[in-house]
């Protein structure tokens, strides 16, 4: 799961677009891909370990604060994701998520992203927030 969340972040950075009319669709693709992977990953983790709900909710709250900022720091987002206690998961299904994240990365075509551009990571952060929320709802550890 930790590898999946890390791959999601890598995907988000590499799939960012340039400041053209296509940026909106690239942002939408990033957000929806990250959201889907985060939903599945969160659900998988919390189904196996519902006691991790507090850690996921804390990460979600921190990501909400980051999303509201003018500038989003990749390393801060990366640190939040890597603090999640998912390295203890024993599920073989995690391989499916890693493969899915890799396919999303390849689909993005690996365009470069300017880490200094304030909004470059925003779609990924929004996708992470929404995905964590949806995964928590599906796992039954959070109410709407």
Predicted segment positions?
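Sec-dependent N-terminal signal peptides
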Residues: 4-14
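Cationic, hydrophobic amphipathic alpha-helical membrane-interacting segments
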Residues: 13, 17-144
């Amino acid at each position: 799961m930790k590898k999946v969340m890390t791959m999601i972040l890598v995907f988000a950075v590499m799939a960012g677009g340039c400041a053209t009319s296509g940026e909106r669709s690239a942002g939408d693709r990033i957000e929806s891909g990250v959201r889907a992977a985060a939903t599945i990953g969160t659900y998988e983790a919390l189904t196996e370990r519902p006691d991790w709900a507090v850690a996921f909710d804390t990460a979600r709250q921190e990501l909400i604060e980051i999303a509201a900022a003018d500038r989003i720091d990749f390393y801060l987002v990366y640190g939040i994701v890597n603090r999640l206690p998912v390295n203890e998961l024993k599920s073989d299904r995690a391989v499916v998520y890693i493969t899915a994240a890799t396919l999303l990365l390849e689909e993005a075509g690996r365009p470069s992203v300017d880490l200094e551009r304030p909004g470059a990571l925003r779609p990924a952060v929004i996708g992470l927030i929404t995905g964590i929320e949806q995964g928590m709802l599906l796992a039954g550890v959070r109410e709407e």
